[in-house]
Amino acid sequence: MYIERFPKIEDKIEAGKVLVIYGARQVGKSSLVKNYIEKLKLNRSNEKQAFFNGEDVNVQAIFSSMNLKTLNEAVGDVSLVIIDEAQVVRNIGISLKLLVDTKPELKIIVTGSSSFELSGQIGEPLVGRMNIINLFPLWEKEVKDASLYDYITDLDFALRFGRYPAVFKEPVVEKKKEIVTNIVNGYLLRDILAFDRLKNSKLILDILKLLAYQIGNEVSIHEIATKLSIN
């Protein structure tokens, strides 16, 4: 079951600009893009598409090259380019600028799990050349439109487990816990630790736990530092 997300890609995408989709891992970026492509197929659009995975070393070599000939050979005659996990590609901003400036008819979608890394790379080169979608876990309007929505039950689950799409769609509580644990350990902490080369994963986890206990209250940095014996 696909849950309709807002804003929609079709409302933000335009030729001659890069559509940047920011969002944490597992929040639904890939599903949003796939749903957009499915809509194009249903509407019998003749747009030719090229999909690139930024974690592929060959893709990294192409889009970090800043070489217009290399970029044009990779893109070919397509009208829609999609680059997933673009934050791991060095010089991605400059390469995208070259494509936008030389192919004004081209539509480009890039997704990034690390807003810090991706915005740092594309911010200056793509000024005036990009639109942005910030994708978060499911929010009230999106959930209310889903067929299995029950306000009281969902509120309880939302407060306990959050609203990552995979968690929301899983009916079994124990499996919800497992999915949340996997997201925290497999993705969230990995991305946090990768930012600015942080290494102390236990300390980060302890800070997150203390922040969770203070939800709804004013956060005291001094109190957190005292409890964890850090400065």
Please place each PLM-identified region on the residue numbering.
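Conserved catalytic/switch belt of AAA+ P-loop NTPases
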Residues: G93-F116, E124-P125
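Short glycine-rich substrate-engagement loop in P-loop NTPases that contacts/grips substrate
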Residues: K48-L80
